[in-house]
């Protein structure tokens, strides 16, 4: 008789290597997210103080770069096309690692974040389309509310002091990685109007050389950085968005470990480049992209114009319903059950948190309304408003369960045997139980000694008291 299959757990315990990688990656992203938040606030202040507004516009639109190479760009343009290529390079490495060593390696495990991310992009696009069509607005911004900003989401978690269990954090990170993949495809397919095939061919040749050098084991930043810059410049001049070059190079790195390796080349390079991406590239992009004029009338327009209302509803309603619905449907069809410590309310809260769309949403907003400066600013204001509402809702929902999360995180990190490895990963190791037994035996012996000393002191005190009574008057 065949034994019944144990239902697969959704949001189950991560392996120790996955947990370690996740902790390192999210630590950097959290710091970067806080810097991103600071940069966004600085941009809004800079752009909205009358005495400083003109200087913000002057700096943002200041052009520099070699015109002969078609690279005489504004500061804001350099931030969007140049610095964000670093962000997408890291996204490419993350995606490659997830495909070869992470949740996306196993088709069954991959189904949950992939379907959730896909639904989390389709539903916001539908919400925007319906809202904009009903109000007679433009459909050009349908892709704006489809993106999730993992750094901003983690910054919110850091600010409100919530410690999500590692399984939910891993889901959020994997969701963001898949989300970035779809965003890359959207940018490449829908925002490429004209192609320069000579430049595109040159970029493809450059990528082939990049791949060949990696295959041959050639090392040295002085080889890859100049080559990467050439590939980026050719991709920019081809008409394809230049950030695609970063993704392509990231995907080419080897992310599986060979025997004797502590880290794969992809993991090593990601460890070096991620702080540059999270700490410099993305905050600078935010500084020169989030500086929109905020007035009472502008905020009112966000909720009255169909395009901007579509963006807000897409982020707040579409993202939440799409991700939550996709997760629930996938769990139903794959017969996966939630981890015992989690509830569907936790998944809903994380889905709400994923409604924070900032970096990529701002980028897509600039591309979608490139020829309409006024609408670009209004859509940016809508992205900021929608992200703020999503962050506020997520804060309330997560705070309700914060005590439970703290307990789960404490249990995940408990290390009674002081081995440096959390106990939950050693429960099947006899040596772990022997170490714990030795620790408790040592503690028991110490407590017995203390008890014996206290008892001896008490008996001595009693005996002394009896002697004093015998020496008294008859």
Swiss-Prot record:
Q: Which InterPro entries has this protein been placed in?
A: Na/H_antiporter_dom_sf, NhaA
Q: Which UniProt keywords apply?
A: Antiport, Cell membrane, Ion transport, Membrane, Sodium, Sodium transport, Transmembrane, Transmembrane helix, Transport
The entry's localization annotation reads: Cell membrane
Principal localisation: membrane
- Output the Gene Ontology terms for molecular function: sodium:proton antiporter activity
Query: What Gene Ontology terms for biological process does this UniProt record contain?
Result: regulation of pH
Q: How does it sit in the membrane?
A: Multi-pass membrane protein
UniProt-listed Pfam families: Na_H_antiport_1
TM ranges: 31-51, 73-93, 110-130, 141-161, 171-191, 194-214, 220-240, 280-300, 309-329, 347-367, 378-398
Quote the cellular component terms of the Gene Ontology held in the record.
plasma membrane
Q: Which reaction does it catalyse?
A: Na(+)(in) + 2 H(+)(out) = Na(+)(out) + 2 H(+)(in)
Protein family (similarity comment): Belongs to the NhaA Na(+)/H(+) (TC 2.A.33) antiporter family.
Function description: Na(+)/H(+) antiporter that extrudes sodium in exchange for external protons.
The molecule here is called Na(+)/H(+) antiporter NhaA 3
- The species this protein was found in: Streptomyces coelicolor (strain ATCC BAA-471 / A3(2) / M145)
Gene transcribed to yield this protein: nhaA3
